[in-house]
């Protein structure tokens, strides 16, 4: 009988679209790198010290697959995971937008669907978790807005208010007058905030708060996975520089607790963006008095570790797994020489993605016709990162 889970794995590999399921079952490749990430996750979980890892890779060589593998490893280590691919709809130059997108794509261990705030429903305002988080929000953040907001969230008996306060924690920020009004109704006194809250200036407080909240909830830490970083290169000059400054907050995570952030970047970024668009000169022109964040990120991309192509032995190991999944998916018993399938894969294209697709096409033909035939893939076009879009202020910029 066909195995539907195995069929999903095969179809994901055939399409070339990155899949969490594929990351779960194909973690054997690049064992040294996987071990290093595993050790880093253990260090974060044990000591609570935050860290980061930025790497580059060619198109189709497994950048996103590595993030999916890290996601599986983190969840097995009882860590919360957030995954954010950068896009036009989810840019990286505006921290409030980053926060909203990350919260929307945050997964608790052993959960297939995103979401975590429902775990706070019903927690008493005098519980150990509440006491820890209220003390943290009052003493450790730049502003004390979250102290008042979280207190209201825990104490309100009005469901509509609770949903509005939860929406704030999800990135739809409540106005200060509305928060003060809710606090006065609940506490019977005025909220005296130490610093007026600005979502563009103080949004990092929310990341810090969540990083502490996840460990207070009993999890071993927070893993943030940022994909498609090269799409920063398609934005305008100032937007790119702001994006680098935001990357710096996670690359050097001094304000985050027990957090591990991974950035996946195209290996073309140095040539197509940093050099061709003169990013170091742009940095000096836009932020002449505060160059360190941007320079640190640009230096990190230039010196980043690049994913090496898999060795023949590593490809053979992956293809052996693919043969097993293909047999389960279509309920057949392949009588195959693994070496022959590896040979077909090696001839099928230069990129890992096309090699695996060629191997699957060969298995399809063996299954359907008993003859593998000849499979080949032509050269793939690569995206041009040299074009850019003009800086256009968003509604968030205009309303802040």
Which residues does each predicted region cover?
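C-terminal alpha-helical "lid" subdomain
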Residues: 160-183, 294-300, 304-400
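A short, basic N-terminal segment
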Residues: 1-51, 371-400
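Alpha-helical repeat scaffolds in large eukaryotic proteins
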Residues: 42-45, 211, 252, 360
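Alpha-helical scaffold elements adjacent to nucleotide-binding pockets in ATP/GTP-utilizing enzyme cores
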Residues: 36, 40, 66-73, 97-105, ...
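Conserved phosphate/pyrophosphate-binding and hydrolysis machinery centered on Walker-type P-loop NTPases
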Residues: 23-31, 60, 196-200, 237, ...
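The catalytic "switch" region of P-loop NTPases
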Residues: 2-7, 179-336
């Amino acid at each position: 009988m066909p195995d539907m889970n195995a069929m999903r794995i095969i179809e994901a590999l055939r399409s070339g679209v990155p899949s969490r399921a594929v990351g779960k079952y194909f973690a054997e490749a690049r064992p040294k790198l996987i071990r290093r990430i595993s050790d880093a996750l253990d260090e974060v979980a044990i000591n609570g010290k935050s860290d980061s890892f930025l790497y580059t890779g060619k198109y189709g060589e497994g950048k996103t697959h590595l993030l999916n593998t890290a996601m599986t490893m983190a969840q097995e280590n009882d860590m919360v995971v957030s995954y954010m691919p950068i896009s036009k709809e989810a840019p990286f130059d505006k921290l409030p937008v980053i926060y909203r997108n990350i919260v929307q794509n945050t997964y608790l261990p052993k959960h297939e669907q995103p979401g975590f705030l429902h775990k706070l429903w019903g927690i008493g305002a005098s519980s150990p978790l509440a006491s820890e988080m209220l003390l943290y929000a009052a003493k450790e953040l730049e502003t004390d807005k979250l102290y008042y907001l979280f207190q209201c969230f825990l104490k309100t008996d009005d469901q509509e208010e609770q949903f509005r306060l939860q929406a704030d924690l999800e990135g739809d920020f409540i106005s200060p007058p509305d928060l003060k009004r809710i606090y006065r109704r609940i506490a019977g006194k005025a909220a005296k905030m130490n610093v007026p809250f600005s979502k563009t200036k103080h949004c990092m407080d929310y990341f810090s708060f969540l990083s502490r909240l996840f460990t207070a909830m009993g999890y071993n830490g927070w893993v943030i996975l940022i994909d498609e970083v090269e799409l920063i290169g398609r934005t305008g000059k100032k937007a790119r520089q702001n994006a680098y400054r935001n990357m710096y907050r996670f690359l050097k995570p001094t304000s985050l607790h027990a957090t591990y952030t991974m950035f996946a970047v195209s290996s073309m970024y140095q040539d197509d963006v940093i050099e061709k668009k003169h990013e170091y000169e742009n940095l000096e022109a836009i932020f002449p008095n505060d160059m360190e964040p941007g320079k640190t990120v640009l230096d990190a991309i230039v010196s980043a570790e690049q994913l090496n192509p898999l060795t023949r032995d590593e490809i053979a190991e992956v293809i052996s797994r693919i043969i097993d999944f293909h047999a389960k998916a279509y309920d057949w018993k392949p009588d195959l020489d693994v070496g022959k399938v590896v040979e077909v894969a090696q001839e099928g294209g230069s990129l890992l993605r096309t090699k695996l697709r060629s191997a699957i096409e060969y298995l399809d033909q063996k299954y359907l016709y008993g003859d593998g035939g000849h499979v080949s893939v032509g050269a793939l076009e690569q995206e041009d990162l040299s074009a850019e879009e003009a800086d256009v202020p968003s509604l968030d910029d205009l309303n802040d």
